[in-house]
Amino acid sequence: MNRLYEHTTKRCTSSQIDAPLWAEVAAHAEAHQLGDVLGAAVNCFETWSVRLRKPGLLSRLTGSGDHDTEHRTVVVVAPRYVVVAVEGKRRGVHVRSARLDGVSLSDPSELHRLVRETAASAGRFGRLPPDDFGMSVTALWSGAREAASFYIGVSDDSEGRALLDEFHSAVTRAKST
């Protein structure tokens, strides 16, 4: 298996988010006028991600690799917004949010399958994409001037799939109202 991270995802409530991270999310919501997203949370998930190997040479030379050996991602889905908070020892806490009706989701597993099939048909297996499980979320994130993609990795189990399914449903609901 060619995974970059070991992900462990579990459902949580906004009251189960530890106090320092909860305060960061609440401050972000207030600064960006999102309302009480923690109180209005429809879904809340937490994923612990442990890096399985160090970043590649180029990433280490340029400093673009993940500096934390493990980090936590909390996804809070409210009726109109999604808030994503990532916390790591070296990176600190980073909180971003987006309107659900402006979110585009891509299932990397489909792209992953196509790349693997193309590599197999060409007889090239050396540089295949990682087998991590998750979803790429493209949106106009808080404070940004243009849309950007953010990958949310989750565990490849019932909890991880529930996060992806419920997030997809929330985006669909927001776009249809």
Model-derived features: positions:
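Anionic N-terminal interaction surfaces
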Residues: M1-V76
